[in-house]
Amino acid sequence: MTEAMKITLSPQPADARWGEKATYSINNDGITLHLNGADDLGLIQRAARKIDGLGIKHVQLSGEGWDADRCWAFWQGYKAPKGIRKVEWPDLDDAQRQELDNRLMIIDWVRDTINAPAEELGPSQLAQRAVDLISNVAGDRVTYRITKGEDLREQGYMGLHTVGRGSERSPVLLALDYNPTGDKEAPVYACLVGKGITFDSGGYSIKQTAFMDSMKSDMGGAATVTGALAFAITRGLNKRVKLFLCCADNLISGNAFKLGDIITYRNGKKVEVMNTDAEGRLVLADGLIDASAQKPELIIDAATLTGAAKTALGNDYHALFSFDDALAGRLLASAAQENEPFWRLPLAEFHRNQLPSNFAELNNTGSAAYPAGASTAAGFLSHFVENYQQGWLHIDCSATYRKAPVEQWSAGATGLGVRTIANLLTA
């Protein structure tokens, strides 16, 4: 490894010779980032991406002005899926260094897990990685159960079983219980439900290559809520929280589900499948039924659910849906505190009725007459939340993954959302 390039911060503008828009300058001592007080964290992240683009793989964050948030902003832009990068961190007080170390451990886990190729990360591997991460931070305060394959069908998890049965890799439900109270009868404060589709071909409603090439990341919701629980634990979470990960491949085979199939769920709902590429909501429904049965104060589900959310927000914001205005406001406040991008999109009672079927109570996709795809997907999920008008948040994870690099991110996973959910859990 070469000698470290020193990176310093300055509130002064760059020398005019660098141009009036220069955010960094280079001198004999290293590189100086010129902060303007308007968006310093974003400036640091974008500068770090440029520094990585110069091929500089060993840096030392030096001088005054560095804190955990600024160090983290640098790392968010500097980290990339290829190659090795080394950062020598500045001196921070114990609390700030612990916060930074926890972000590096947990959010990097989220990014690396989402970036992993589907060949290496199937449903069982995803569930086990989640168990390992949370057990590492929570120790004996965690218990879990893994249900897979035909056991899912026998126990009535028909959405997850139906979607996953077309793959040689069995579908898996992880039910994890973080109980710091030690009391088996303690009430469950919150349930987190994650979509863990480890590869999504679209099934018989097959995706084009341009839409399939990033579908190793379709388990981004599961990774995000797993990371959020782990991160909340490092921040002192003292309430009981349960995690449900619905993990499967969505592939084509002679045993794969087909258009026109009808799924009967444990809550009595019957769903006609008219698009096998709208599979995420089918597996989440099983997790939401289990979450509702716990009678928690709070249910949060997270999923890379719809292209419609990305059409609305790009990859810059996570989309938030809720009937509970006060709770939605709390999550948006948490997002602001953590400097993470969330945007609330519409969800109304009429969206619940925009999934008509001639053969079942619900269709798994809206018709051309109802084009608000992200809202109708949230409306579908609401049918599996017992008290959907209170205490439920749905996050459509449109900011989880980028197919190509941009000025502040490398290609791949971002890890956005972990801190916001953890903040809400520990508020």
From Swiss-Prot:
Enzyme superclass (EC): hydrolase
Keywords: Aminopeptidase, Cytoplasm, Hydrolase, Manganese, Metal-binding, Protease
Cofactors, names only: Mn(2+)
Primary location class: cytoplasm
Ligand binding (Mn(2+) 2): K195, D200, D218, E279
Any one cellular-component term (Gene Ontology): cytoplasm
Annotated positions binding Mn(2+) 1: D200, D277, E279
Biological process, per Gene Ontology: proteolysis
Note accompanying the cofactor annotation: Binds 2 manganese ions per subunit.
Its EC number(s): 3.4.11.23
A Pfam family that the UniProt record links to this protein: Peptidase_M17
Compartments where found: Cytoplasm
GO molecular function, a single term: manganese ion binding
InterPro entries for this protein: Leucine_aapep/pepB, M17_PepB-like_N, Pept_M17_PepB, Peptidase_M17_C
Cited function: Probably plays an important role in intracellular peptide degradation.
Assembly behavior: Homohexamer.
Protein known as: Peptidase B
Biological source species: Escherichia coli O127:H6 (strain E2348/69 / EPEC)
Lineage, highest ranks first: Bacteria, Pseudomonadati, Pseudomonadota, Gammaproteobacteria, Enterobacterales
